[in-house]
Amino acid sequence: MARYRHSRSRSRSRYQRRRRRRSRYRSQRRRYRRRRGSRRRRRRGRRRGYRRRYSRRRRY
């Protein structure tokens, strides 16, 4: 049983690492897309996005 548990935890850590990398790439792409948007819309979205990013960094 212990052996099975160990293998499971190992696979989970690997999956977690991959997930983090993917989320980072996705957020980057979204930012680029927003920048291309209209100026008025960009200002509003940028402020909201910055707040979210700051909170995430603090948590980390």
Curated annotation (Swiss-Prot):
Source domain of life: Eukaryota
GO MF entry, a single one: DNA binding
Start and end residues of each stretch annotated as Disordered: 1-60
Record keywords: Chromosome, Developmental protein, Differentiation, DNA condensation, DNA-binding, Nucleosome core, Nucleus, Spermatogenesis
Localization per Swiss-Prot or TrEMBL: Nucleus; Chromosome
Tissue: Testis.
One BP term from GO: sperm DNA condensation
Main location: nucleus
GO cellular component: nucleosome; nucleus
UniProt KW Nucleus keyword: yes
Keyword Nucleus: yes
Family according to the record: Belongs to the protamine P1 family.
Role summary: Protamines substitute for histones in the chromatin of sperm during the haploid phase of spermatogenesis. They compact sperm DNA into a highly condensed, stable and inactive complex.
Protein's recorded name: Sperm protamine P1
Protein's gene: PRM1
